[in-house]
Amino acid sequence: MTDSAYRVDTISRLAQWRIHNLSSSTYRKSDPFKMGLWNWHLSVEKSKMLLNVKLYPEVSNLTRENPPVASFALRVVSSTGERKALSHPEVIDKRIKTNEDFIWTIEVPLTGKIIIDVEFLDLKVLSQDSGELYSIWANGSTENQSQVTAVTSLGRMLTESIYTDITINASDGSIGAHRAVLAARSPVFRSMFLHDLKEKELSEINVLDMPLDACQAFLSYIYGNIQNEDFLIHRLALLQAAEKYDIADLKEACHLSLLDDIDTKNVLERLQNAYLYQLPELKASCMRYLVKFGKIFEIRDEFNIFMQCADRDLISEIFHEVLSTWKGF
């Protein structure tokens, strides 16, 4: 028997298996065919007057961890003698993991040449985050690809200086950017360009409180192509820029990141920034680190210097935390 006897042809969402000679007692399993994220098999088992047709995904880590939830229409056509076409009712959202999860038993005698058509109507997977099903073919897939492409193109506009129309002057250098992008991401930038301010007239924005590498990281975040290493290095500068230019998502990203790696070397600086930029969770975490976990004793000299320079309200909060935590010790 030739290899083509086991081949399943596919086009778009249709899979078709042509079996040229189905004898009275036989079992056949197709070659794997790709549909969606998975490789699939069809199999037929004929016994006397019954024909069992199975559809199932190939065993793999993907199938085990995230099996497909399939909707499909299945049809068997026998072209020997009088043509017979049998259709299975549409299967909707059927979870198929093994070769026992979908079986169509046909009680009509079929011999000779048959064609099995499977038209996949939809394939879904379970979201690991929300626990909800989503289609791999829905508009969201195209939308996601479109978003990825758009962000990549936006990043190239910055890195390759494609049709830049405004210059950002940092403390030690300059970089070109685009008014429309800046205005879309920051109400402060948008206000600059709407009103007859010097930034609009000169096509320049001075951010002289930022070095060029931090400014580059700031713009990379705005354009959607920042690297994690650059983000971590420049978190505090990015936090300052987020506050200055009213970019709430950047401020929150910095806030969450600064919570991750508090230690004795950075806790005082982060406490000061948490107070300055009104980050209550970061402030509370720094307080607990210093007081409840006793790290205040490991940096006694640095803490004394900090207390001489800190804002009075912050000093008051620290004393309140100390009294509250150490009460009764």
From Swiss-Prot:
Q: Which terms are listed as keywords in the entry?
A: Ubl conjugation pathway
The organism's lineage is: Eukaryota, Viridiplantae, Streptophyta, Embryophyta, Tracheophyta
| Pathway where it operates | Protein modification; protein ubiquitination
Q: What is this protein called?
A: BTB/POZ domain-containing protein At1g55760
Q: Which organism is it from?
A: Arabidopsis thaliana (Mouse-ear cress)
| Stored SMART domains | BTB
Query: One biological process GO term for this chain?
Result: protein ubiquitination
Q: Which residues form the BTB domain?
A: 164-231
What does the comment on domains in this protein's record state?
The BTB/POZ domain mediates the interaction with some component of ubiquitin ligase complexes.
Q: Which Pfam families match?
A: BTB (PF00651)
* Function (record text): May act as a substrate-specific adapter of an E3 ubiquitin-protein ligase complex (CUL3-RBX1-BTB) which mediates the ubiquitination and subsequent proteasomal degradation of target proteins.
> GO cellular-component terms in the record?
nucleus
